[in-house]
Amino acid sequence: MLRWTTAGESHGQALIATVEHMPAGVPVTKDEVSYQLARRRLGYGRGARMKFEQDALTFLTGIRHGLTLGSPISIMIGNTEWDKWTTIMSSDALDMEDPDNVAAMSSGRGAKLTRPRPGHADYAGMLKYGFDDARNVLERSSARETAARVAAATVARSFLRETLGVEVLSHVISIGASEPYVGAEPTFADIQAIDDSPVRAFGKDAEKSMIAEIEAAKKAGDTLGGIVEVIVEGLPIGLGSHISGEDRLDAQIAAALMGIQAIKGVEIGDGFEEARRRGSEAHDEVFLDDNGVYRNTNRAGGLEGGMTNGETLRVRAGMKPISTVPRALKTIDMENGKAATGIHQRSDVCAVPAAGVVAEAMVTLVLARAVLQKFGGDSLSETKSNIDTYLKNIEERMKFEGLEDGA
């Protein structure tokens, strides 16, 4: 089974992405990984850190001459600001008799962080793990970790492209209380136009409304969340399964998206709006003509019974406002219990555009895993052969002899 993990801290020496059980022969380039990481840094309302957060890439294992080997793949993303953090984030014990260490750890970025931010992992993490310094929590809980997920997903993107010819895209539906995008569904041909938008919007009216929201929040010393949508065209019927809850593809996608920092809700297709409809208005009727099976609607978002049904996969995720609010929120000091305001780290007003790219990454990884679960293969060519056989069987199954015109 395809498996991915990440390691590293926000201000540590590096982040590591590991991908296991990817078939041999999948093309991967540093340029493509760098391109996807750059997309993650996009967005109106990003903080100053994005100017520093360049991504120094190293392919450590599992790739030779631009192709995967079938062995574990590990990708390292170096921290270009590491020289500023070598003492503070040192993995070795510090000699606190050394005046330089004392100075580094007693003020500025090295000072102990004892005022947990409401909405962040600080408070629960300090208590759960017995830490007296919130840095031990926030370094790993930071959304900087998602850079490693995007790197891992770039390998999965190539796998999906090579095996199924599909691409994964996202766009921002709304930010804060902006007017949500309502209009034609974008296709992958629109991805450059979406990325060229400062808020990754597909529609100028929605873009203007989102930018206005961000400007207002910035002036008010506040932060914003929003809604992103991920779209995937061309998936075959039958990825996932109805057999058990954990095998349902919608459950896997929802879990992966909810695992992104600050994501608070997920809906497939029309999602919660479906709950307001009657059954006769909620489901996508099936028709057959000379060109094959078709539907006039896609309210299910491409998933029925935990399986892809051949329609476009459509998923939305809701991101809460960033927890590091410039006008710091009320909290308590964990050192003495006194009333305080939350610690302030360099952060963004709005990271919703970037969240769309991360959501793409997680959907990509889940889909790649589903493809390998369904079709297997130790090499790319073997997986493609298995897919071709399956698709031919589906095509044969859907040929109906003696069907009268209009039947």
Curated annotation (Swiss-Prot):
Keyword rRNA-binding found: no
Cellular compartments per GO CC: cytosol
UniProt superkingdom: Bacteria
Cofactor (UniProt): FMNH2
Free-text comment on the cofactor: Reduced FMN (FMNH(2)).
GO BP, sorted A to Z: amino acid biosynthetic process; aromatic amino acid family biosynthetic process; chorismate biosynthetic process
EC number annotated for this UniProt entry: 4.2.3.5
Binding of NADP(+), residues: R40, R46
Pathway the protein takes part in: Metabolic intermediate biosynthesis; chorismate biosynthesis; chorismate from D-erythrose 4-phosphate and phosphoenolpyruvate: step 7/7
Catalytic activity: 5-O-(1-carboxyvinyl)-3-phosphoshikimate = chorismate + phosphate
GO MF annotation list: chorismate synthase activity; FMN binding
Top EC class, one word: lyase
PROSITE patterns from the UniProt entry: CHORISMATE_SYNTHASE_1 (PS00787), CHORISMATE_SYNTHASE_2 (PS00788), CHORISMATE_SYNTHASE_3 (PS00789)
Annotated positions binding FMN: R140, S141, S142, Q261, A262, G305, K320, P321, I322, S323, T324, R346
Keywords: Amino-acid biosynthesis, Aromatic amino acid biosynthesis, FAD, Flavoprotein, FMN, Lyase, NADP
Role played: This reaction introduces a second double bond into the aromatic ring system.
Family the entry assigns: Belongs to the chorismate synthase family.
Subunit details: Homotetramer.
Name of this chain's protein: Chorismate synthase
Organism of this sequence: Corynebacterium glutamicum (strain R)
Organism lineage: Bacteria, Bacillati, Actinomycetota, Actinomycetes, Mycobacteriales
Gene name, Swiss-Prot/TrEMBL: aroC
